[in-house]
């Protein structure tokens, strides 16, 4: 294997919005025998916070629910077994706030030449807040000369979250108007401010002889902060806001059309608190990570929709059509799903505690590791459903129908029968 000669790695760091996301990537070369670099240990430090951005006559505060750290390697590789950072981590908060550390899940994946770390907060959490002190990310195996490491942190529409809006509209607008306008602002911020990346760090080999120990990135000189003191004018955005506010309709689909939004793809991760979507057809929509607490979703068509990690606590989904929908890791605590059709839906690891599922159709649904504690399942159809690892504590199952289910031991079957469940076949 061709190895570089005596080298000193050089770095460049660019944090575009350091008040909201600040990233450092440090390297420690591991020498082989003499002066050749055989491996490079990577160490990550990352800070998440909220940031104000002036827009027209007002301003918005935003943060991030997650994002992706992508690394591209030149003449190097980092196979999965060389990844160190993975699983749940704690983000330390400012001591002056006296708040508890925030938990964040980090998933590592990708090819050996282009590994990826996906960051995501807990379901229902607003934004990531706090700092991860310098932590070993993994080890790069150097394959030749010249070598290079490029790391970029990017966010998608589902990762950007508004925590406050001031001076752009009245607080008396409807929940539907608010949901559409906030989503328009998120996409505007993403397209005009947050792309192509939030942070970028580049390390590369130096062809000249020098010391072997690398220096940490010079972030002071290369970090660029946005100027949040001056108001920026965006007349087209102001026009959209005005047209949504003055619209003679509160229909969600019509408001989305006025704002130039596609309801099937533009609301992933959106905050849709308390909106009215009763009877609306959003079959096949990408609503992953959406926040729908307290929303009226009765009689909706959400068949085949992606609602992974969605927050639907207290929402009314009575009579909704959710067949084949991906509802894994979704939160339905105290939601009403009475008479809903959830046939063949993926409810793995979903929180259905205290939910009303009376007379719902859950046939052939995947309820692996689902929480059904204190759920109302009386008269529900549960035939062919998979209950591996499901929790049934104090759930109501009178006249609920079971047949050919996976994951139900004889002990559980007896317990459910004693509570009034009906087993057929």
Q: Residue spans of the language-model regions?
A:
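N-terminal soluble segments of membrane proteins
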Residues: 1-11, 184-222
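Membrane pore-forming effector domains from diverse proteins
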Residues: 72-84, 88, 94-206
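Tandem repeat scaffolds
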Residues: 228-425
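An N-terminally focused, membrane-permeabilizing/fusogenic/translocator signature enriched
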Residues: 1-88, 94, 212-216
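Intrinsic-disorder-associated interaction segments
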Residues: 14, 33-37, 170-179, 183, ...
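Positively charged, hydrophobic/aromatic-enriched amphipathic segments
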Residues: 1-48, 110-137, 341-361, 366
């Amino acid at each position: 294997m061709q190895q570089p000669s005596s080298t000193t790695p050089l770095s460049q760091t660019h944090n575009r919005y350091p008040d909201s996301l600040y990233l450092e990537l440090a390297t420690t070369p591991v020498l082989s025998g003499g002066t050749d670099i055989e491996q490079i240990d990577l160490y990550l430090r990352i800070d998440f916070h909220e940031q104000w951005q002036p827009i027209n006559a007002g301003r918005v505060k935003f943060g991030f629910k997650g994002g992706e750290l992508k690394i591209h390697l030149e003449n190097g590789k980092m196979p999965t077994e060389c990844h160190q950072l993975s699983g749940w981590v704690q983000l330390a908060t400012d001591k002056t706030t006296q708040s508890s550390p925030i938990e964040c899940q980090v998933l590592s994946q990708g090819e050996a030449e282009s590994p990826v770390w996906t960051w995501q907060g807990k379901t229902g959490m607003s934004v990531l807040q706090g700092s991860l002190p310098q932590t070993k990310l993994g080890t790069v195996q150097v394959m030749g000369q010249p070598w290079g490491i490029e790391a970029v942190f990017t966010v998608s529409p589902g990762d950007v979250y508004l925590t406050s809006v001031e001076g752009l509209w009245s607080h008396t607008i409807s929940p539907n108007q608010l949901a559409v306008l906030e989503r328009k602002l998120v996409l505007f911020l993403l397209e005009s401010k947050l792309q192509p990346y939030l942070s970028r760090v580049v390390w590369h080999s130096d062809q000249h002889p020098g010391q072997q120990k690398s220096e940490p990135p010079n972030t002071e000189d290369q970090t660029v902060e946005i100027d949040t003191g001056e108001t920026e004018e965006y007349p087209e955005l102001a026009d959209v806001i005005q047209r949504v506010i003055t619209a003679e309709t509160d229909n969600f689909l019509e408001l989305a059309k006025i704002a130039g939004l596609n309801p099937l793809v533009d609301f992933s991760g959106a905050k849709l608190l308390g909106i009215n979507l009763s009877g609306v057809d959003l079959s096949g929509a990408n609503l992953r990570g959406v926040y729908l607490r307290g929303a009226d979703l009765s009689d909706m068509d959400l068949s085949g929709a992606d609602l992974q990690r969605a927050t639907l606590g207290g929402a009314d989904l009575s009579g909704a059509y959710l067949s084949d929908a991906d509802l894994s890791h979704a939160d339905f605590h105290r939601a009403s799903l009475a008479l809903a059709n959830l046939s063949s839906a993926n409810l793995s690891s979903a929180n259905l505690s205290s939910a009303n599922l009376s007379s719902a159709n859950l046939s052939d649904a995947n309820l692996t590791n689902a929480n059904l504690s204190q759920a109302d399942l009386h008269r529900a159809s549960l035939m062919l459903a998979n209950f591996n690892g499901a929790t049934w504590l104090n759930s109501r199952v009178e006249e609920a129908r079971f047949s050919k289910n996976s994951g139900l031991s004889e002990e559980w079957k007896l317990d459910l029968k004693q509570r009034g469940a009906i087993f057929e076949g």
